[in-house]
Design a protein with these regions (language model features):
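Active-site flanking residues adjacent to catalytic metal/cofactor-binding acidic residues
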Residues: 9, 52, 147
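Metal-dependent catalytic neighborhoods of phosphoester/phosphodiester hydrolases
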Residues: 59-64
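Active-site neighborhood of HAD-like aspartate-dependent phosphohydrolases
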Residues: 16-17, 21, 38-39
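Acidic-leg catalytic submotif of subtilisin-like serine proteases
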Residues: 5-12
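Short beta-strand segments at enzyme active-site cores
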Residues: 46-53
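Active-site-adjacent betaalpha module
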Residues: 1-5, 32-44, 68-186
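Short glycine-enriched, charge-decorated loop/helix-capping segments at active-site entrances
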Residues: 20-27, 65-71
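Short, glycine/acidic-enriched loop or turn micro-motifs at the edges of active sites
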Residues: 13, 17, 56, 151
Length: 186
């Protein structure tokens, strides 16, 4: 029997709120989709894991990649948006780079839960979603990305990332409401 975990990646105030330091405008449109995915995961008894950027004020990512400071540990911008707040029993995994696996306890958490399949939502499609999906595939997880539950900085980058994940990595790309077997959930 497959055990799937729902990953909610970087749905933080510094990415979602209007005027935020690294605003991804389309994230606001995916909130209702992610809310439904959370309800579905809870109903199926699947774990929900929030994978969240968490940077030091002088993080090398800002210098190395030219990103503006964002998701600084302890700030409001590093908090999950109110609409998607973690519930008791949900896991929160901080990360300081694009991958949810690199330098984190995500893999250990998944192993302890007996998870073999991941369902990814959040942002940014062509950065943290795609890199986390790649790392998961390389670790032999079955990976599904909810197409209408992820957002990119630009539509063309979002679409390209979905194609690459599907055609190169073997990631399953589905619309929200599709269950682990690929059927449309009731």
């Amino acid at each position: 029997m497959k055990k799937e975990a729902l990953l909610v990646i970087d749905m933080l105030k510094d990415f979602v709120l209007s005027g935020a330091s690294l605003e991804v405008p389309d994230t606001r449109t995916i909130i209702p989709v992610i809310q439904k995915e959370i309800v579905r995961a809870r109903a199926e008894g699947n774990p929900i894991i929030y994978v969240c950027d968490a940077h030091d004020q002088d993080d090398k990512e800002f210098r190395k990649f030219g990103w503006p400071p964002h998701a600084i540990k302890g700030t409001k911008g590093a908090q999950v948006v109110e609409e998607l707040r973690p519930a008791p029993g949900d896991s929160v995994i901080p990360k300081n780079t694009y991958s949810g696996f690199y330098g984190t306890r995500l893999e250990e958490t998944l192993e302890n839960m007996g998870v073999d399949s991941l369902r990814l939502t959040g942002c940014v499609t062509h950065i943290c979603i795609m890199v986390t999906a790649s790392d998961a595939v390389l670790r032999d997880y079955k990976v599904t990305v909810v197409e209408d539950g992820v957002a990119g900085l630009a539509r063309e980058d979002h679409d390209a990332a979905l194609r690459i994940m599907k055609n190169v990595m073997g990631v399953e790309i589905v619309k929200s409401g599709t269950d682990i077997s690929g059927r449309i959930a009731a």
